[in-house]
Amino acid sequence: MSADNSSGERYLALPRGRTLAYEAVGNTSSKTVFLYLHGSFAIGDASKASPMLLRKNIHFIMPTLPGWGNTSPPPPSTSYNDCLTSDMTTLLSHHYPDSKGHDIKLYIAGSSFGTVPTQILYGAPYDKFPFGRCIAGVLLMGAFSPFRYHKDYAKCMTWSSYIVIGPVGYYMPFNLMGRLVKFVLTRKGTTIEDAETSLRENLFDRMDQAERETFERWCEERGRALGETERGMAENLVKSVSKSWVGFMLMSPVLHSDWGFRPDELDEEHSRPHVLITASKDDHSTPPAYAHYLAANYKNVRIKYVDGGHMSLLYYLNEVWAEFLADEQ
């Protein structure tokens, strides 16, 4: 057993002069791999990996997605799907050069926007993502549905989501809405303090009293001072756009794009892994209706509901990890 519980960003050289940033902790020689894909305005950060995960003899890998942080954007004329599957194949092949996509046990997970690349990997053709044959489980936390096929996706959106990533933003030419949002956000400031203020206004200050008390208990149980979580998220937010805003600018096009498959048409082999979807009952960013659509169209799937809004999944993570990895000792 080769345990490495010290996090720190690492860099993998990719073809065409690109770079993939990632962090990894746990048993680096384990053939059980947990690949976690982050959401928007974030990076691959394993510094707060759950001790419960580390006790399960798992190699925990958190890459930074294309166009965010220190990971290069997709090359010109390369689709997001092809870039993602190529990057993740290179990353896993780097750690498991002799596996040829056959002899590891792979769990893939994502939260919020990270559920989109997670689903792309889940349904990807095996010639594009050979490690797809190794997938044992898929975890989608605060999931997005594929807007291309979920015709009612916009009905449960907030006005801000409807404008930025919904029909308004998507159908405006030249990604003008994304450019406008980027302009507004950069005008508000790009320091850690600016990001922390924005996070408080848009996430933490919108908690009701019950969720605020749950959050405070969660911090206390983990020995975190009040404000520490917000500060950490703000630091990663700033890092995520420190090199470019390409990751953000790709969000709306990717949400509306062809992910390479229809959820209701996945073949039997792709549908083999169990899929766990978690949905927060009062989440307005990724409404439960998205989880309902996915559950109705994927096979071998189950939904786990939790109380609270978009942030509330944070408080149930250990419970979710344990349920998702119940077969791992």
Per-segment meaning from a language model:
Residues Y153-D264:
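Alpha/beta-hydrolase
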Residues K105-D152:
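Conserved hydrolase catalytic core segment
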Residues F248, H284-Y290:
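Conserved alpha/beta-hydrolase "acid-adjacent" motif
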Residues L53-P74:
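Conserved alpha/beta-hydrolase
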Residues H292-Q329:
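Catalytic active-site module of serine/aspartate enzymes centered on a nucleophile-bearing elbow/loop
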Residues G39-M52, P73-P74:
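The serine-hydrolase catalytic nucleophile loop
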Residues H270-S271, L276-A279, D283:
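Short beta-strand/loop motif that positions the catalytic acidic residue
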